[in-house]
Design a protein with these regions (language model features):
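Phosphate- and other anionic-substrate recognition elements at nucleic-acid/protein interfaces
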Residues: 2-167
Length: 167
């Protein structure tokens, strides 16, 4: 089970950010954010197809348990000439479908998923910047880092200023 930090929770100002980089191997992470404070990376990981749904379900358990608003961010998957040739192409679409079903199971409209382009996330938050921010995931093939990238891009879009990058 995903556990958030202990203590009283002010559900009016705190929110969760669940971020997914879907694919054959998927990156998933969960952040907690309160305006005026640094975001906290609760967990991150890389998951194979048979493992993919459980961490998402766990994040939704935390969402229900703590009553915090949740933003669900997902890398946009666009079918183009390259992805048609790529044998892994259907995996991303299938994983997005699983994410949408889990949202429906928790009475969350899947149309509220915030899709972001991989190029935007990588342009804004390089590996060097993720390290400087302290949001580095060790191990894996980089999918967890891509999920983290999408989460911090979302955080920046809702008002978080990554001041550690200004030093």
């Amino acid at each position: 089970m995903v556990r958030l930090r202990t203590g009283a929770v002010n559900t009016m100002s705190k929110r969760l950010i669940l971020s997914v980089d879907p694919g054959k191997a998927s990156g998933i992470c969960l952040f907690e954010y309160e305006k005026g404070y640094e975001p906290k990376l609760i967990w991150s990981g890389e998951y194979q197809q048979n493992e993919y749904a459980q961490p998402i379900r766990n994040a939704f358990v935390s969402y229900v348990q703590y009553g915090m608003p949740i933003d669900i961010v997902c890398e946009r998957f666009t079918i183009n000439a390259q992805t048609v040739r790529n044998s892994q192409a259907p995996y991303s679409l299938e994983q997005i479908g699983i994410l949408k079903q889990i949202m429906l199971d928790h009475k969350i409209d899947p149309d509220t998923i915030i899709f972001q382009s991989p190029a935007d996330a990588k342009a804004m938050f390089s590996n060097e910047k993720l390290k400087k921010l302290g949001f580095w995931h060790k191990g894996g093939e980089g999918h967890a880092l891509d999920a983290i990238r999408h989460a911090v891009l979302r955080l920046a879009k809702i008002g978080w200023i990554p001041t550690k990058l200004l030093d």
